Amino acid sequence: MRWMDAPRALAVLALLLLGACNKRDGLSSRDAAALTGGDPHAGREKIREYGCDACHTIPGVPGADALVGPPLAGIGGRMYIAGILTNTPDHMVQWILDPPALDSATAMPNVGVTEEDARDIAAYLYTLTSGREPPR
């Protein structure tokens, strides 16, 4: 696990606090990239590549309207990931990398996502709002 330096930790805290003030709005692509170290535009493509759209409804991803897993609109504004992890960028990346390692009872499989791709996917997810298209 990577540890954040103090300035980055403060930036993450500030962004999370801003998100807590207005849970309906996702982050801008630039803020999401700074928060996660990933590329939200690449993350949108990786979501399809890894088949996330087969189980989840994901705004901005054509055809991602499945109802097996929870809908991901507004996930960046939720307090918890999968009901067990506080919603932080590092936890989001860890969850995307290997869900069963964090919750053996989860139905979400480990699909072999690389750390770089997990950061990109996390960046995209943090741009999602509560139902509207993500920022471009």
What label would you give each PLM region?
Residues 1-10:
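Bacterial N-terminal signal peptides that target proteins for export
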Residues 22-48, 135-136:
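Electrostatic cytochrome c docking/interface patches
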Residues 36-38, 45, 63-128:
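Extracytoplasmic electron-transfer domains, predominantly the class I c-type cytochrome c fold
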Residues 52-55:
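Short cysteine clusters
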Residues 129-135:
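Short, low-complexity, Pro/Ser/Thr/Gly-rich segments in the mature regions of secreted, periplasmic
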Residues 17-20:
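C-terminal motif of bacterial Sec signal peptides marking the signal peptidase cleavage site
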Residues 27, 61-62:
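Short, non-ligating residues that shape and space the ligands of small metal-coordination modules
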